[in-house]
Amino acid sequence: MVNVDTKLLVIFVELLSKRNATYVAEKMHMTAPAVSHSLGRLREIFDDPLFIRVPHGLTPTPKALELGPKVREMLDLWAAINEGDIATFDPLEAAGTFNISFAGTLGDALFDRFLLRVKRLAPGLQVRLTESSSWEADVAAMRSNELDLAFSPFPTRHPEIVEEVVTSFNMWVCARKDHPVLKDHCSLDQYLECEHIFIAQGNPGTRAAPSLIPLDYALQQRGLKRHSTMTVHAWRTQAEVAAQTDMIFTVNSLMKDLVCETYNLNAFPLPSELETVLGLNMLWHRSRNTHPMLVWARNLFKQVVAEYTGKASIAPMHPPMLTDDSGKSGKTGKGDAEKEDESRLSV
């Protein structure tokens, strides 16, 4: 039986993820020769080259790809042993900082409610909610334990990230109450006739998103396109402009009621030809899959979503999705996800 240093396995996982020894050395605060020495030791242990040098880094051997999920599972189990049991987690005794990031296009109403619940149940936690600047920044922050949970309309399929689609929802069209075109419904022709206020998407390409969001893709398939007049940074600006002009905007159902009540707007279902279902993706780093506080927080978020959307419960249909290093999706053993929905956000 070979005695393997846990740090060697961590280096193996990082090499499998980054495929660049220099990046791994920087992340783990090691020298490049030290990483090379560790790789040599791993090759001896597993009797395989594991990684082949190529012009732009390393490429894993079939043996390395086969070992990847097993080594990750072993490290996750070891982390769970060190972290303790969720059954013994007491939110009243919890301390530290709880960091959450969300894509601005989702709106903040649901997350504000979630944070209030966290503070009520775990008063000792410092809670920090920020709007995501980029997907790369979120992954880097989760990797360094500076970000606990992230929420996005886009699935990631990133090898380091566990993702769960918590719920799905539809899109609505918002306009001022005395709008000259949208009076009691919104047809496709009316939708295209109006000028639209878009919300800035940031860089969707970094989130494995298509070049067009589903709503605009559906229009393109028909040879159609929305008339974009203005692009703003937040839903509040969309609503303020729409309340004073004939411009309209499209919002998800989680935000619809708040938007309409606050700014005295009407909301109409998206034209049936363009009906788009969205997914709310909850994301976390796989190294913290069994962290007691985060397991508690994820379950609490799903409870808040169930209350907010009017559902009695959110029944798991599929477990959270893990992406292995070959690019295929797999599933973790303790699922707490609703039906997986790979829809992206439409605005």
UniProtKB/Swiss-Prot annotation:
Signal peptide: none
Comp. bias (Basic and acidic residues): 325-347
DNA-binding region: 21-40
Outcome after substituting N264S: In strain: ACH0158
Known outcome of mutating I314N: In strain: AW1 and ACH0158
Effect of H185G: In strain: ACH0158
Entry GO CC: protein-DNA complex
Pfam assignment, any one: HTH_1
Record InterPro entries: LysR-type_TF, LysR_subst-bd, Tscrpt_reg_HTH_LysR, WH-like_DNA-bd_sf, WH_DNA-bd_sf
Impact upon substituting H185R: In strain: AW1
Example GO molecular function: DNA-binding transcription activator activity
Keywords: DNA-binding, Transcription, Transcription regulation, Virulence
Domain HTH lysR-type: 1-61
Job description of the protein: Regulates the transcription of one or more of the genes involved in virulence.
Family: Belongs to the LysR transcriptional regulatory family.
PANTHER family per UniProt: HTH-TYPE TRANSCRIPTIONAL REGULATOR LEUO-RELATED, TRANSCRIPTIONAL REGULATORY PROTEIN
Protein name according to UniProt: HTH-type transcriptional regulator PhcA
Organism of origin: Ralstonia nicotianae (strain ATCC BAA-1114 / GMI1000)
